[in-house]
Every structure is written in structure tokens, then in C-alpha cells.
């Protein structure tokens, strides 16, 4: 299939094989294929030697990432590779890809036809499509959640276009939609796959509300949808795959994380699991975790080596990180901080967000731990008690004095991390305050340019690129140099 025949993506992709939904409009010639309609993707290569290489896996991952971008509510994606006479079927979800193992399509043609026909006959649930929301008028969808203050369920209509979604596979997959009750905007519905070892965000928000915290979002409703353990139930995982290395200049769809809000978002790099390798499993869906970041270092961009060993978690105890898909509806809705309209508004928003952080820490006894431009919103002071900004997203927060979560993925937003946090020092409130300072620098250096230098071309290469590229130690060293006397003026 040529690139011009595939639409619905910001990047030009050429997919060898795909399975798509039937056109909903009668008379559609089907000449164009849209990523939002793709159900299964496949890669076709001439040589059987390509069947179990990083290059083949990464090519499939690129396709899968495009499917996730076009279908942000997708739970998992089926993919397969046919290399010469060899075939391998894959499933990608937010905890990593896993495969069926390799077989010869000539020697086992029955299995080949069974897999292909199986793809064609799968239900929406078996394909990993959005089955937890219901189609509504004007291309929108509805979802039922549990009310936070009343025992009754609440029916909310979601705006068709997400406010925010992630450009990644192995991640929390955070996606946000405006949520309406009738024609009135109630708040924001946030869908995310969080580790089962972390305390649910709704619990922390309700605890903060009970303790009188000011300046954070209020819970309207919540719902637990499904978990990776549910999706993988019945699978038996074998030993990890050993992938061959082949030269490639492609960036990893597994290691690179990019977020978007509306038309543009800044790049966000999340701290990854220190070691997740592919596994084989019995049944047509088998297991594979993300290869070590270090194994990609010569062929992938934005790869980060972790200096952290997950506390209270033995990487040999579990073959994958069990994530739980939850929907959280909060109020009020706001604009991301980088959409500030004036320097004064930027400073007022940051001031109120810092006040909210102070209240969260001192009154709520909760440490946020993920201060970034993605987690500060601009609000209407006339509607939220005079506050121009609020602090959101407690996915990675923890109650002061509690032990380590033991979650496999110790995540954070790379460019805003405090220097000591990058060097594996325990996270404190001071590190969050340091992150607020980096948010201010980021707004001025990255977003302020196009706001105040209209008519001039923004430099293609930013000095701040080194804030999210390389190992943790390299980023910390470079960032420290920027913060020292003589270095700060350069940025």
C-alpha cells in the first residue's frame, strides 16, 4: 500500500498489510484507508532472517503507535510479521508487546490460515477496541461513571476530539476528553493505565478534599474499567526472546513518548522500566516485554538509561507490569499552561499552582512528584475562587510517610525533573519546587519565542534538548551546568 492511500496520521507511513473496518458510508470506494479504521497491522519481508530482529519489531511498533494515536481509547492492537516463510503474531498493549512465537507458514499452513481468519472474525472486544463507551450523536461517545458524592451513576458525553493523548505504546496512555452532562461542560474525563501497585488517583484526590487542600481538581466521578491481567488471563509466558541487532536509524515507538494537546504539545519523556524483555507465550497471543533501553542506544533517539532499581519489586517476580485502566472525571476544565496569553498570566498561573502544591503538601500531607507543564492548567478565576491556575494529575503522587509503591515504572516528565531526582535521590517537596522553576524556563525558552518574537524563525535546535536526551546522569550533569553561574545566561 502506498503512503498516499493511508490518511489520518501526521506522519507518512506505508503499511504492508492491514485489516480494516468496513466502510460505514455506502458507496465508499475504499481507495483511501484511515488509521482510525485499522484493526490489525502486518509487516511483510522477503527474508526469513528478518523474523526476529529489532528492526521488524520496531517497524510493527511504528504501525501500532499510529493506531493508538488515531484510536486513543484502544485497549490493545494485534500485529503480525511474515518474513519469507516465517510468521509471528503479536499483541501490543500498554505493558509491552508479546508474541505467539515463530512458525513456518508452509509446514504449518493450517495455523497460518487459522490466524488470518481469526483476525477477520474477531469481535470488537477481541480486537481491543473501545467497548467501555457508547456511540452518541455527532460522533461523540458516552460513558457511565460512579458519582463521587452521590451513590447514583452519572452518564456523561465525551467530546469527540481528545484534549490530550500520548504518542506512545508502553506508558500510562493518558487521554483526556471534555465531559458534558447534556450541553453543559461538567469537567474533564481522564483515561489512564496506571500500575496496580500505585494508589488510585481518585483516592488521593478525595483524601486531599477531606483534608481541605485548596487549588486542586475536584472529583466528579470515577470508574475502574479493566486491567492488563484481565486481558492476558489464560496466557502462559515462556522465556524472553533474544533479538538480533540490525542497523537502523529509526526512532523507537516503544521508548519514545510524545504527548499532544489539541494541535500541538511539548515532548514528554517518561522514566521507563529498567529491564523489560520479550517473552514467548502459549496460545495465539504470547508475551514480550520492551527490550532494554540500553540495547537500543545505537539505533534509537530519546532513549534513556535508568539509574533506578525499582524498590520492593523483583523484576523476576512478574513478567509484565499489571496496569489498570481507570476513568476519572474532574472539575474544572482548563487550558494547558503553555497556552498563556501574556507573561503576567503565566506568572499568575505558576503562582497559584505553587500555592496549590503547598496546600497539597502541608494540609493534605501528599507530595505531587510530577510537576510539569502537562500538569498545570489555566483556569477562570471568576469560576474557581479567584485562582488563575491549578495543579492536576496525582497519578504519581504519594502520601507523605508512606513506603515505596514498588511499581515497575517509576515515571516522571524528563525535562522537568530535579537534578537530584535524576541522580536517584529520594524525592522531596524541594525537588517539586525546582521542577516549577524548570516549567517557567521551558515556557520562556520554548513557547515564549513564538509569542514574543513574531515574524522571526525559531531556532531548530534548542539547548534544552539535552534536558531529555541521554542517560539520567548525563541529563543531570548538563542541567546542573545550565543552572550554575555562567551557564544560565546561555539558555
Predicted regions and their residues:
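Conserved protein kinase catalytic/activation segment
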Residues: 375-392
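Catalytic-loop of the protein kinase fold
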Residues: 361-380
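Short C-lobe core helix of eukaryotic-like protein kinase catalytic domains
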Residues: 351-362
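Conserved activation segment of eukaryotic-like protein kinases, specifically the C-terminal portion
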Residues: 406-421
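Conserved end of the kinase activation segment
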Residues: 420-431
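Intrinsically disordered, low-complexity terminal regions enriched in charged/polar residues
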Residues: 1-316, 320-324, 329, 337-341, ...
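Activation segment of protein kinase catalytic domains, centered on the conserved DFG
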Residues: 335-349
